[in-house]
From Swiss-Prot:
Keywords: ATP-binding, Nucleotide-binding. It comes from the Archaea. It comes from Staphylothermus marinus (strain ATCC 43588 / DSM 3639 / JCM 9404 / F1). ATP binds at G10, M11, P12, G13, A14, G15, K16, S17. This is UPF0200 protein Smar_1234. Disulfide bonds: none annotated. Pfam families: AAA_17. Belongs to the UPF0200 family. Coiled coil: none annotated. GO terms for molecular function: ATP binding. SUPFAM superfamilies: P-loop containing nucleoside triphosphate hydrolases (SSF52540). InterPro entries: NTP_hydrolase-rel, P-loop_NTPase. HAMAP family: UPF0200.
Length: 189
């Protein structure tokens, strides 16, 4: 069985965690690229806050290259087989790193800024922006990493403007089809 990577991309609060939930329910391993930053943040700052996370994010890219987070994620997954999900890809440079190791597709989750802002406010995650200006600032930081390009080149798109159940069903069906396709491709070859 070959490795097949589903790269999940979306702006903050778009609903990427719904895709992770659907993946876990299908028994697929999920890797979060944010975990690499979380580990580096503890190493560099000894404390994890949204500010130290953001600073680490910028710092490691500058020090070790735009592809660093993807390379670190690859170290964890390259021995894996079958369909896996990687949450949080942010640039085409990162996409290229994954493409070298396996067949990949990009699954994007989209919701309008207004919807994302309302949902972020409700989820009450520490460090989330609580006003429109900070929300826009965070969006721009993500876009500077190149996230907009990844979303523009997505193979699949979930528009998450309806209910959570609807988005979950969309994600579940896409992932299930990919699992079936990968199984078929492997039995053919
Ligand atoms: N369709 C929906 N209806 C209502 N609430 C939703 C919907 N989709 C997501 N949410 C809620 O909106 C919030 C943001 O979603 P989620 O945390 O999945 O976003 P994310 O893309 O993982 O964000 P980040 O990149 O910031 O981690 C969560 O509290 C989630 O439960």
């Amino acid at each position: 069985m070959k490795l097949f990577i589903v790269l999940v991309a979306g702006m903050p609060g778009a609903g990427k965690s719904i895709v992770s939930k659907a993946a876990r329910d299908l028994g697929l391993p999920v890797y979060n690229m944010g975990d690499v930053i979380r580990m580096e943040t503890s190493r560099l700052y000894g404390i994890i806050t949204p500010e130290t996370m953001r600073e680490t994010s910028r710092r490691v890219r500058k020090l070790y290259g735009e592809d660093y987070v993807a390379r670190k994620t690859i170290e964890q997954i390259k021995e894996k087989r079958g369909v896996i999900v990687v949450d949080g890809v942010r640039s085409l440079v990162e996409v290229e790193v994954f493409k070298k190791y396996a067949e990949t597709v990009i699954l994007a989750v989209h919701a309008s800024p207004k919807t994302r802002f309302e949902r972020i406010r409700k989820r009450n995650r520490p460090g989330d922006p609580d006003n429109w200006e900070d929300f826009v600032k965070r969006d721009l930081t993500e876009l500077q990493f190149g996230l907009g390009n990844v979303i523009a080149l997505a193979d699949y798109m979930i528009v998450n403007e309806g209910s959570i159940e609807e988005a979950y069903r969309g994600a579940y069906n896409i992932l299930k089809k990919l699992v079936e396709k990968n199984a078929k491709d492997n039995s053919d070859s």
